[in-house]
A protein has these predicted regions:
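Extracellular/periplasmic envelope-modification machinery, especially enzymes
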Residues: 253, 316-320, 324-327, 334-335, ...
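Membrane-interface helix/loop caps of multi-pass membrane proteins
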Residues: 2-378
Length: 704
């Protein structure tokens, strides 16, 4: 929600406006606690900020004062930054204490972004879901996106209004009418952009451009206010209706936001701002002392309530607030906000020594320096810890490579003790203990184990666990496949060698690509890959989205026009809410691919859940071949017969990797001292690299 900033101008004090802020703050609290009503607080607070700022600016300009952009900026941010900085510092400290280590870097990034007013753009960049129901997984600083948006407008609006005033005076125009005209145009242009912009990712909620029209509408109405006078009785009647509309939106979910529907509560808010001074029932309700008191501290309430909500849910390991604890946390939030207002906000805002432009600038500079220095010191600590974890992981990969090079460790279960030359009556020599970080090799090793140290990778190195390749794919592949956004098109090896093609989503990238590259390096193949996040390779399926369906169709077209020797793909699809199934139309897809002359190598998908498997595993201590959190295989994977329809297709070879994910009916999250998953469903690069030698040997066996 946008922060309910108190008017920074000397305007006639109106208790009803403070009461209006309180109503909107209650809407924010109820929505954040229980998703009650429509998220209109963001829109209504924008209206109040723009309306009051513009009203004051026009009054000063009409009185002959020269607009001072610097004074406006320093007045605004002197008031906003100190409470914000304290909130960020305390929240970051509490987050380090309560949140999993893998989330610490995100908190540091958001702390920097919040203090420098671009948090909304950061959240849009990482595709944050504002309406996610599991608040425990939300960032404790997520709510400050709105403060960033307002901060951007508080920088832009004074400069824009000052420029309009200067030009209006030079052209002999009315300042009020010029400002009205400018903001009417901005309102129209911004609304047109909002209505015509596609938002498949849902990140438009954090986009400043999506709410410029709301700022502009508030400014336009403020400029037009003198022409909107009504008789006292009519003004009071309009205020009552407006308050009723606002309360309705506070209690009932109506429309989508941001969107044109926001115009209704915005106009209701405008009516209360315009006509509330006429008194009457609406003004009387809004001037009720408890509401006025809440309105006076609404900025601080907004700052502190969300971190309190989220960190409480993390501490008690719950996804949502109940009625009792929700109300209790609201009371706590109000109490903390009252302290923050009394000892930080009010003194800085009201003491005479803090009101010169120089002093205001010094307060802003000192506050920013203290806040950014605090966050930077934590960042340095994370860098040091991350570097230590990275070096530890690199050492583990060296021991893993040594283990993988020994055939007895790679796939000893594949050896048939009853085969020719082996006497089943003679007990085999005992195998040496498996040590170090063998990863997947431990899942198939029948001997003893002697693991020491923590499982890898560490929580601060998970960003390095995504498989990345630098090689470019061929020109024909690029021409067809790169027309689809966020498609990875990679090439590895000598293009004149026999060719392997890997297609699929990030699951294929994490599991199949390490094996394909190892096979290329050892046996002299050229590997080409077309990988698209969130888009498993299957028959083109409209349900997967136009872009994904187009990508998959382009892959098949490419293979038909540029035949390859081998194609690697994942032929099943797991689900967090059901049992594994064959990929959509995968039988027809394999038939189409083999018709090009390619041999198809298929494996099954890895585990997919609603639980952060890394965090779950990190709380356990592995001391056998597998450990961490143990999941029940039948809950996620189908029986082995799921592959039967594909086995009848000439040119298809199934490579079984299920024993690298599960042992019997138990699926661990740590194997051979290596974390298998980095989140809810992606295999770590480290584990994928330990799988690669085993998969390569099995591919060779399948092709014999």
């Amino acid at each position: 929600m946008v922060v309910p900033v108190v008017a920074l101008q000397k305007t006639p004090h109106r208790n009803d406006i403070q009461g209006l802020r309180a109503v909107l703050m209650l809407q924010v609290l109820f929505f954040h606690a229980w998703f009650v009503g429509s998220p209109i607080g963001v829109d209504a607070f924008i209206m109040i900020s723009a309306f009051l700022m513009t009203s004051s600016f026009i009054r000063r300009s009409e009185a002959g004062a020269t607009p001072s952009v610097l004074e406006r900026w320093t007045t605004t941010f002197k008031r906003l930054l100190p409470p914000l900085t304290i909130t960020v510092a305390v929240t970051l400290t509490a987050s380090i204490a309560l949140l999993p280590a893998r989330r610490w870097q995100d908190m540091v990034d958001q702390s920097f972004a919040s203090l420098t007013y671009w948090q909304n753009w950061l959240l849009a960049h990482v595709s944050t879901d504002y309406f996610a129901e599991d608040h425990a997984l939300a960032s404790p600083l997520q709510h400050l996106w709105s403060m960033s948006m307002q901060g951007q407008m508080f920088l832009l609006w004074p400069a824009l209004m000052a420029l309009t005033v200067v030009l209006a005076r030079k052209m002999g125009l009315s300042v009020r009418r010029a400002i009205f005209g400018v903001f009417v145009v901005i309102t129209a242009l911004s609304l047109i952009w909002l209505v015509t912009t596609s938002d498949p990712s849902g990140t438009i909620y954090f986009d400043t451009r999506a709410r410029i029209w709301e700022f502009a509408l508030g400014s336009a109405i403020a400029a037009f206010a003198p022409y909107l006078r009504l008789p006292t009785l009519a003004a009071r009647a309009v205020s009552v209706v407006a308050l009723g509309v606002l309360v309705l939106f506070c209690l009932v979910s109506i429309g989508t936001y941001p969107g044109p529907m926001a115009a209704v509560p915005l106009l209701a808010t405008s009516a209360l701002l315009l006509f509330g001074a006429a008194g009457g029932p609406a003004a009387g309700v809004l001037s009720w002392r408890p509401l006025v008191m809440l309105g006076n501290i609404s900025y601080s309430v907004y700052l502190v309530h969300w971190p309190i909500f989220v960190l409480y849910l993390v501490a008690v390991d719950r996804e949502a607030l109940g009625v009792v604890d929700g109300i209790a946390l609201m009371v706590v939030s109000v109490a903390v906000a009252a302290v923050l207002t009394k000892y930080v906000d009010s003194p800085i805002r009201s003491l005479p020594w803090a009101n010169t432009t120089l002093r205001k600038t010094q307060i802003i500079g000192l506050t920013l320096w203290l806040g950014l220095t605090f966050v930077f010191n934590i960042q340095v600590g994370l860098w040091k810890t991350s570097d230590a974890q990275f070096r530890y992981a690199e050492d583990s990969r060296a021991t893993s490579d040594q283990v993988s090079a020994q055939p007895a460790f790679v796939d000893v279960l594949a050896v048939d003790n009853a085969s020719e030359g082996v006497d089943p009556e003679v007990e085999p020599a005992p195998l040496p203990p498996l040590t170090g970080f063998p990863g997947a090799a431990a899942m198939v090793y029948p001997g003893p184990f002697a693991f020491e140290g923590e499982a890898v990778p560490g929580p601060l190195t998970l960003d390095n666990e995504w498989v990345m390749y630098e090689g470019k794919c061929s020109d024909p592949a690029r021409a067809l496949l790169l027309q689809h956004a966020k498609t990875g098109c990679h090439g590895h090896g000598d293009p004149t060698n026999p060719r392997i093609f890997v297609g699929g989503s990030s699951h294929a990238e994490q599991v199949l690509m390490p094996a394909a590259r190892l096979l290329a390096d050892q046996d002299g193949y050229y590997v080409e890959a077309a990988l698209k996040a969130g888009c498993p390779w299957s028959a083109p399926d409209p349900a997967s989205g136009e872009d994904c369906a187009g990508h998959n169709a382009a892959i098949l077209q490419y293979l038909q026009e540029n035949p390859v020797d081998y194609v690697f793909l994942i032929v099943t699809a797991t689900s967090a809410n059901g049992v594994e199934q064959l990929g959509h139309g995968v039988v027809e897809l394999v038939e189409d691919v083999t018709a090009t002359g390619a041999t198809v190598i298929g494996i099954r998908d890895n585990l997919r859940t609603n639980t952060d498997l890394y965090q779950c595993a990190a709380s356990q201590t592995p001391d056998t071949s597998y450990g961490g959190c143990l999941l029940n295989r039948p809950d996620y994977f189908a029986s082995d017969s799921i592959i039967d329809p594909l086995l009848e297709i000439p040119g298809f070879h199934y490579v079984n990797v299920m024993d690298l994910y599960c042992s019997g009916d138990v699926c661990p999250t740590i194997a051979g001292n290596v974390q298998i998953y980095l989140d809810t469903n992606h295999v770590t690069q480290t584990y994928g690299q330990t799988m690669a030698p085993i998969i390569v040997d099995r591919i060779r066996d399948a092709l014999k």
